[in-house]
């Protein structure tokens, strides 16, 4: 299938796991490996409710009755359990596949976590910067960014090759069951947000759903399903919200020149392009006038040099 004819998923939906034992009491991390932390009873219920919301959302368009879902899930126990509960809302024929994907796992905070030491470490992280700080024996958000970027490349290859879209008449939805920071990094990578913008984002709640929906022009936006107020509570700035609204109707491949993080943050000292053009035009006119003056002088000199010399009123 050519890139021009590739079939894009209608939605890419990020879901954070339900409430875990570690969310309820961080002391759990001191005795239990992070990847083995389980959901609480409340977390299981949250995951079931998330499944019902997902089903209602995906099946809401009566003009697209033949929809399908493909799931990606982090290998951690709490995300796998969340997906298991979400799956109760879907019949088998609606799910075309599930893939456990290590690259969307939680940020590694460094093996067993001693409570007091972790509290002090997180204070240092706030001073250093949440994106670049690397936990001892663990990862930074920048490390997570690298592996999420790799995952996205694989995701796009699957889309380009139409590996997941079994039937072109089916409306496809991707659901990614992952973790709070990983979901924020995913959005950062997808929408090309800066480090500063990432550090202003708030973590999603347990079993919270964030929906990237395909707009009419072929670009994805958070502003189709979510309100401006929701986006603001997530930590998106007014400029970021405006960009999401633009993406909802933009044609794929269009360049939004007035996004400040694409240009203005680096080149705000430059002269306005219109003024620069006016200056260049003035300089060009001055050069042309100078050249014209030189040509006139040369012609005048030539005329005088070709006139016959006169002696006593007669030609010699």
From Swiss-Prot:
InterPro entries: His_Pase_superF_clade-1, His_PPase_superfam, PG/BPGM_mutase_AS, PGM-Related. Residues 275-316 are annotated as: Disordered. Induction: By sucrose. One of its GO terms (biological process) is carbohydrate metabolic process. The active site is at 17 (tele-phosphohistidine intermediate), 106 (proton donor/acceptor). SUPFAM superfamilies: Phosphoglycerate mutase-like. Belongs to the phosphoglycerate mutase family. Phosphoglycerate mutase-like protein lacking PGM activity. May play a role in carbohydrates metabolism. CDD domains: HP_PGM_like. Residues 279-291 have a biased composition (Acidic residues). This is Phosphoglycerate mutase-like protein AT74. Expressed in roots, leaves, stems, flowers and siliques. It comes from Arabidopsis thaliana (Mouse-ear cress). One of its GO terms (molecular function) is catalytic activity. It comes from the Eukaryota.
């Amino acid at each position: 299938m050519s890139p021009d004819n590739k079939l894009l998923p209608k939605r890419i939906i990020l879901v954070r796991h339900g409430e875990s034992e570690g969310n309820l009491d961080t002391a759990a991390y001191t005795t239990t490996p992070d990847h083995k932390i389980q959901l609480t009873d409340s977390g299981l219920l949250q995951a079931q409710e998330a499944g019902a919301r997902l089903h209602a959302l995906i099946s809401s368009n009566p003009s697209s009755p033949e929809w399908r879902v493909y799931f990606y899930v982090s290998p951690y126990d709490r995300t796998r359990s969340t997906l298991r509960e979400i799956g109760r809302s879907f019949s088998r024929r609606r799910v075309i596949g599930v893939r456990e994907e290590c690259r969307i796992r939680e940020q590694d905070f460094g093996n067993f976590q001693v409570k007091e030491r972790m509290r002090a470490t997180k204070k240092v992280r706030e001073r250093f910067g949440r994106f670049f700080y690397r936990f001892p024996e663990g990862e930074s958000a920048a490390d997570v960014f690298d592996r999420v970027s790799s995952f996205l490349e694989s995701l796009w290859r699957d889309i380009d090759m139409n590996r997941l879209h079994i039937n072109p008449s089916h409306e496809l939805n991707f659901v990614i069951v992952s973790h709070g920071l990983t979901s924020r990094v995913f959005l950062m990578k997808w929408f090309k947000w800066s480090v500063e913008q990432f550090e202003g984002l708030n973590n999603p709640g347990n079993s919270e759903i964030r929906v990237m929906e395909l707009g009419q022009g072929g670009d994805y936006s958070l502003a189709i399903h979510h309100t401006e107020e929701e986006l603001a509570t997530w930590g998106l700035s007014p400029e970021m919200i405006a960009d999401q609204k633009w993406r909802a109707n933009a044609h794929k491949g269009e360049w939004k020149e007035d996004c400040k993080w694409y240009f203005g943050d680096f080149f705000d000292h430059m002269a306005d392009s219109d003024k620069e053009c006016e200056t260049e035009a003035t300089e060009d006119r001055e050069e042309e006038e100078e050249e014209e003056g030189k040509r006139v002088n040369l012609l005048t000199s030539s005329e005088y040099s070709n006139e016959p010399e006169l002696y006593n009123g007669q030609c010699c």
